[in-house]
Structure formats: structure tokens, C-alpha cells
């Protein structure tokens, strides 16, 4: 009798079978009986089966047709589980607060991050994500060259909980993995400005080797740059990529106040 193999999809999905990892992911996400939780790339339902015991509502999102059928049979009697068969990039993300606990398809990590931490900024509360180690480590570089990474750190506390070995998955991946915890910060920010804020970051990072002083002078007057430096404790001689997320946000908010809109980056 031939042993049935689990499918390995083009998106790089590897199924979590480590019960300790599953327990830690759920604990780190601080799930309550009031939460709606998305399980992106639900696979065989190894995470979903634990989430449904805690969360108010679990949405298991899976793109593999055979696995979608399996999930629907497995959770046919679970009133708080909704199985959605689609690529997460085409999924209608909730317009209300939600969390994510997921072992995501590694191949679409960047897209998932953008959907959660940029497009869904107003409703994504955070959670736990198991993903490839390399892109996780890039989130914690001392110098941030990627505008989206600056954006994510502005609005979320990101924590690399620990590295995860290949033996925690079926089939075992050839790359190292990690457990990432995400918590949204409590900031007073009008989310209608999120695209403008990203444009502001992107504009100033076009020449990442410029000093903070030189980069800011492309938007602010010389006297305004000096004032901003004193107000927010900026090192004007440091590279622009060395600004902290809070300094980025403060500079942006200052631009909204003192720079005419026609001079704002777009």
C-alpha cells in the first residue's frame, strides 16, 4: 500500500506538525473568545483545529482544491469555522478587527505582509506568523532600506520569538523558519494618510546614503529641518536609513503641518 503524500504547492507551503510551535503561536497571539482569527494557508487544519477552541470565529483560507474539500469535511460541524477556498491575495479581508495565526505560504510572504500591515492597517490587530527565517531577519536590520519595513515598524511591534527547525513541518523545508509575533501599536494616526506616509518614506529612501539633513531639505526648508532635529532628537549627519520608526512618523506629521500640500511627495 502506497503512503499518501501531502501536496507541496508552488507557494512553498509546509504544514506545521509541531504541537509546541502551534501552542506557542496561539499563546503569543493572545487570542480571546471575542476574536476573529485568519488561518492563512490552513492546509490540513493543524492550526485551525486548535484555534476553533479559543476564538469566536476562525476563517481557514486555503488555495489547494483538495485541501479545501478536506477542511470543509473536517470542520463541517464546527459552527465557528469558515473555510474559504482562494489565494489569500484575492481574499476579501474583513472590514472589522481581526488577528492572524498562520503558517503562511513562504512564497507570498511579502504580499501577505502588505495586505495585513498596510492595506488592512485599520483592522489588523496582530497575531503570530510562522514564516521563512531570512525575510524575518530583514525586518530587524539596523538600517531600514525598504519603505514597507519602516511602515510596518511604525504601526506594529514586531518580535522574532524563536527560530524553528525543519522537523516542525511536513514536508520539512530546506530553509530555516521562525515564529514572528505582531502587535499593533496604539498610535493616534488618521489612517486616511497611510498612502501619503508610505509615499513620504519611499521618496526619502530613494537615495538611502544621503544624510538626514540633506534628505529632509528636499521637502523642508533649512530652518524647518533644524527645528525638527531639535524637536525630535534627530542626528542630522546620520544616514536617512538610520531614522527610527517613531522619528519617521514625527517627520511626516511635521510635514503635514508646516509644508504646503503641493510640495508633499506622491
From Swiss-Prot:
Gene Ontology terms: biological process: response to antibiotic
Domain of life: Bacteria
Root EC class: transferase
Stretches that traverse the bilayer: none
Keywords associated with the record: Antibiotic resistance, Methyltransferase, Plasmid, RNA-binding, S-adenosyl-L-methionine, Transferase, Transposable element
Cross-referenced CDD domains: AdoMet_MTases (cd02440)
Molecular functions per Gene Ontology: RNA binding; rRNA (adenine-N6,N6-)-dimethyltransferase activity
Binding site for S-adenosyl-L-methionine: 14, 16, 41, 62, 87, 103
Enzyme Commission number, as recorded: 2.1.1.-
Keyword RNA-binding: yes
PANTHER family linked: DIMETHYLADENOSINE TRANSFERASE, DIMETHYLADENOSINE TRANSFERASE-RELATED
Sequence similarity: Belongs to the class I-like SAM-binding methyltransferase superfamily. rRNA adenine N(6)-methyltransferase family.
Summary of the function given for this chain in its UniProt record: Involved in erythromycin resistance.
Protein name: rRNA adenine N-6-methyltransferase
Annotated organism of origin: Bacteroides fragilis
Lineage: Bacteria, Pseudomonadati, Bacteroidota, Bacteroidia, Bacteroidales
Amino acid at each position: 500500500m502506497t503512503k499518501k503524500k501531502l501536496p507541496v504547492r508552488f507557494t512553498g507551503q509546509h504544514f506545521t506538525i509541531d504541537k509546541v510551535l502551534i501552542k506557542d503561536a496561539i499563546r503569543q497571539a493572545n487570542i480571546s473568545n471575542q476574536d476573529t482569527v485568519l488561518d492563512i494557508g490552513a492546509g490540513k487544519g493543524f492550526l485551525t483545529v486548535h484555534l476553533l477552541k479559543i476564538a469566536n470565529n476562525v476563517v481557514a483560507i486555503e488555495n489547494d482544491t483538495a485541501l479545501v474539500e478536506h477542511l470543509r469535511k473536517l470542520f463541517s460541524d464546527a459552527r465557528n469555522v469558515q473555510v474559504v477556498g482562494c489565494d489569500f491575495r484575492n481574499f476579501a479581508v474583513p472590514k472589522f478587527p481581526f488577528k492572524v495565526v498562520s503558517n503562511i505560504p513562504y512564497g507570498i510572504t511579502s504580499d501577505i505582509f502588505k495586505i495585513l500591515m498596510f492595506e488592512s492597517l485599520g483592522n489588523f490587530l496582530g497575531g503570530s506568523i510562522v514564516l521563512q527565517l531570512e525575510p524575518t531577519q530583514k525586518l530587524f536590520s539596523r538600517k531600514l532600506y525598504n519603505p514597507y519595513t519602516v511602515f510596518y515598524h511604525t504601526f506594529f511591534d514586531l518580535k522574532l520569538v524563536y527560530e524553528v527547525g525543519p522537523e516542525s513541518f511536513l514536508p520539512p523545508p530546506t530553509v530555516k523558519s521562525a515564529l514572528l509575533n505582531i502587535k499593533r501599536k496604539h498610535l493616534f494616526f488618521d489612517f486616511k494618510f497611510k498612502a501619503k506616509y508610505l509615499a513620504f518614506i519611499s521618496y526619502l529612501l530613494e537615495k538611502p546614503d544621503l544624510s538626514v539633513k540633506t534628505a529632509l531639505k528636499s521637502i523642508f526648508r533649512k530652518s524647518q529641518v533644524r527645528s525638527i532635529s531639535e524637536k525630535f532628537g534627530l542626528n542630522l549627519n546620520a544616514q536617512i536609513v538610520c531614522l527610527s520608526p517613531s522619528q519617521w512618523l514625527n517627520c511626516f506629521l511635521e510635514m503635514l503641518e508646516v509644508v504646503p500640500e503641493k510640495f508633499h511627495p506622491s
